[in-house]
UniProtKB/Swiss-Prot annotation:
Entry function: Located at the top of the head of the 30S subunit, it contacts several helices of the 16S rRNA. In the 70S ribosome it contacts the 23S rRNA (bridge B1a) and protein L5 of the 50S subunit (bridge B1b), connecting the 2 subunits; these bridges are implicated in subunit movement. Contacts the tRNAs in the A and P-sites.
Biological process annotations from GO: translation
Naturally occurring in which organism (per UniProt): Bordetella pertussis (strain Tohama I / ATCC BAA-589 / NCTC 13251)
Gene Ontology cellular component annotations, sorted alphabetically: cytosol; small ribosomal subunit
Similarity-based family: Belongs to the universal ribosomal protein uS13 family.
UniProt keywords, alphabetically: Ribonucleoprotein, Ribosomal protein, RNA-binding, rRNA-binding, tRNA-binding
Annotated protein name in UniProt: Small ribosomal subunit protein uS13
Family matches, as Pfam families: Ribosomal_S13
The protein's assembly and partners: Part of the 30S ribosomal subunit. Forms a loose heterodimer with protein S19. Forms two bridges to the 50S subunit in the 70S ribosome.
Region (Disordered): 92-121
Gene name for this UniProt entry: rpsM
Amino acid sequence: MARIAGINIPPQQHAEIGLTAIFGIGRTRARKICEAAGVPVTKKVKDLTDAELERIREHIGVFAVEGDLRREVQLSIKRLIDLGTYRGMRHKRGLPVRGQRTRTNARTRKGPRRAAASLKK
């Protein structure tokens, strides 16, 4: 099993798809990494040689991926919260940040509905 950036890449998948298991690498970036490393995108991960894996690791090393990228994202969110920006407040309150409506929908960000207090006479 190939291990790149601390992640076990699924051996049955093509190189391009397997690389997307790494946080911070999508299809486009995975394809560019494979092309730069000289690895065919349709080659299975289990069929990659050690030299090919090493070239892929070198090209991935250029990008912020996994822990570094997660830390970077968390620090930028923390900075927004500390500055007291509107976006920071939305993050803090667990509401949508990018202007989506919240009167209806937004359930993913807001979480499950709370039971409404019933008024009894």
